[in-house]
Regions:
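Conserved strand-helix element at the start of the C-terminal RecA-like helicase core
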Residues: 146
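Long, charged, low-complexity intrinsically disordered regions
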Residues: 2-138, 150-219
């Protein structure tokens, strides 16, 4: 786990995937107390760790997610990687839960438009299911929890990459949240809902664009 400086960036590499969530949370809290803001970036296998640490931080401290995105980057020494990048601060800039609820209400056939990602399904199978649903609907929702988050993000990035989807496709909303664990109602786990829509261009804020460029240049 390395901490670089473009503002404060906690960069979680694939090799960090087995690190303790609380160790990352400690870094987030420290960064927030120092400067009032921190960027958390997870690469490939470490994306779930990043999501878990972000969620825990917002649950135990006055910390809010004001910007969160996923992207596919070409990075030195790592090649093509899937990335999740979030900017955390102490100011609540928007209500992602309300935006997700609005998107859910707009779905015409929620059960058909929702693709649940699990480790039991191959990426090829998931891609095929998504393409079948996109042939019927303009919008689909990809959901996952726990370690399947890595696959869900990879799936979404493959779909918006332009190589396999028949229609131009973009990310309308990325929602990171928590759900109660089925086998232990006293515990929660990170989960994501990724809303993909035809004709939408995936947009990044200026801050995220600059950070992603620096990641590609090997900050």
């Amino acid at each position: 786990m390395s901490q670089e400086s473009i503002g404060k960036v906690i960069l979680l590499q694939p090799a960090d995937a087995s690190a303790k969530t609380t160790d990352v949370v400690e870094g987030i809290i420290s960064g927030i107390m120092e400067t009032g803001e921190v960027n958390v970036v997870g690469l490939n296998e470490a994306m779930f760790l990043a999501c878990s640490a972000i969620n825990m931080s917002t649950e135990i401290a006055k910390v809010y997610v004001d910007d969160i995105d996923i992207a596919s980057l070409l990075m030195p020494n790592l090649g093509k990687v899937a990335v999740i990048s979030a900017h955390l601060s102490q100011k609540q800039a928007g209500d992602y839960a309300a935006l997700a609820e609005k998107e859910d209400k707009a779905l015409t056939d929620p059960s058909e438009q929702t693709i649940s990602v699990s480790r039991a399904s191959t990426m090829e199978r998931l891609l095929t299911i998504c393409l079948l649903r996109l042939a019927k609907f303009d919008e689909v929702k990809v959901v996952a929890a726990g370690g399947s988050i890595n696959d869900a993000i990879t799936l979404a990035l493959k779909l918006i990459g332009g190589q396999i989807s028949k229609d131009p496709l973009g990310i309308k909303l990325f929602h990171l949240h928590s759900i109660i664990m089925r086998n232990d109602p006293t515990k929660s786990i990170a989960a994501v809902s990724i809303y993909l829509q035809k004709g939408v261009t995936t947009r990044y804020t200026k801050r995220q664009s600059e950070l992603l460029k620096k990641l590609e240049s090997g900050i």
